């Protein structure tokens, strides 16, 4: 009992410390944590460098992973490199990866794609708050076609996914429809909770204009070996990112001659 209380207190303190990164101080951080415990959907507005952004209690794990632990920091040079890189953020959640990329390169042209209607509302709010005209967002589910599909929403907002038993309907968008008219795509980030097989394997040739792809695989939810096989035919250079907190594989794929 005592050990459990100590563990919970330590976790609360650790979370309060990193939450101060986005809020005015410890009092604001504690207030945010207590309100989120009562209602995980309650909205808080904080700051990430020059950007105001909003988040919920159910988004804490995403905040920690993307902005505190800087999981995508290995992409810094790729985002900095082109003067105005074209980036597709597929499975954008509330837009944290996009915010990170805009901090690295304020003139990046980003399209964020998010399936969950509730999460999309926060994403849309963050796009507006950023005041970046090069950042746009659409409420669609990355899929093998553009049909309407069912979507399951669960307590941890990072784990929403396509599911035949899901209670939410959302229109799909295929890889071809998403990339059509974009020209060269400097970077595509994909984190879509198991839909990566349907999204990428339906028409791999459409990946031709994508210079770099970073993708999280979900072995329990799709045939990730099939995804790997498809990617190896398109991207000669593939590295699995090591040292992650998550056990899910994160692959960084590049075309021949494309710098890291």
Please report, for each region that a protein language model flagged, where it lies by residue:
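Phosphate/nucleotide-binding beta-alpha loop and adjacent structural elements of enzyme active sites
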Residues: 1-260
């Amino acid at each position: 009992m005592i050990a459990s209380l100590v563990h919970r207190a330590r976790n609360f303190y650790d979370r309060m410390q990193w939450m101060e990164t986005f809020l005015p101080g410890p009092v604001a951080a504690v207030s945010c944590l207590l309100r989120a415990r009562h209602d995980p959907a309650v909205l808080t507005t904080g700051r990430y460098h020059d950007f105001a952004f909003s988040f919920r209690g159910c988004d804490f794990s995403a905040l920690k992973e993307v902005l505190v632990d800087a999981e995508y920091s290995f992409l810094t040079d790729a985002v900095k490199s082109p003067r105005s890189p074209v980036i597709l953020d597929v499975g954008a959640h509330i837009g944290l990866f996009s915010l990170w990329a805009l901090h690295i390169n304020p003139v990046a042209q980003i399209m964020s794609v998010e399936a969950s209607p509730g999460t999309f509302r926060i994403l849309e709010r963050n796009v507006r708050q950023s005041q970046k005209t090069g950042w746009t967002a659409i409420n669609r589910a990355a899929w093998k076609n553009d049909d309407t599909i069912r979507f399951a929403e669960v307590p941890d907002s990072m784990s929403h996914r396509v599911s035949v038993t899901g209670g939410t309907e959302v229109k799909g968008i295929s890889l071809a429809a998403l990339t059509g008219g974009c020209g060269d795509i400097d970077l595509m980030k994909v984190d879509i909770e198991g839909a990566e097989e349907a999204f990428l394997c339906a028409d791999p040739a459409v990946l031709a204009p994508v210079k770099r792809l970073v993708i999280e695989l979900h072995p329990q939810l799709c045939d990730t070996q099939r995804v790997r096989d498809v990617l190896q035919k398109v991207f000669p250079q593939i590295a699995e990112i090591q040292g992650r907190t998550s056990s899910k594989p994160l692959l960084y794929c590049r075309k021949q001659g494309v710098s890291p």
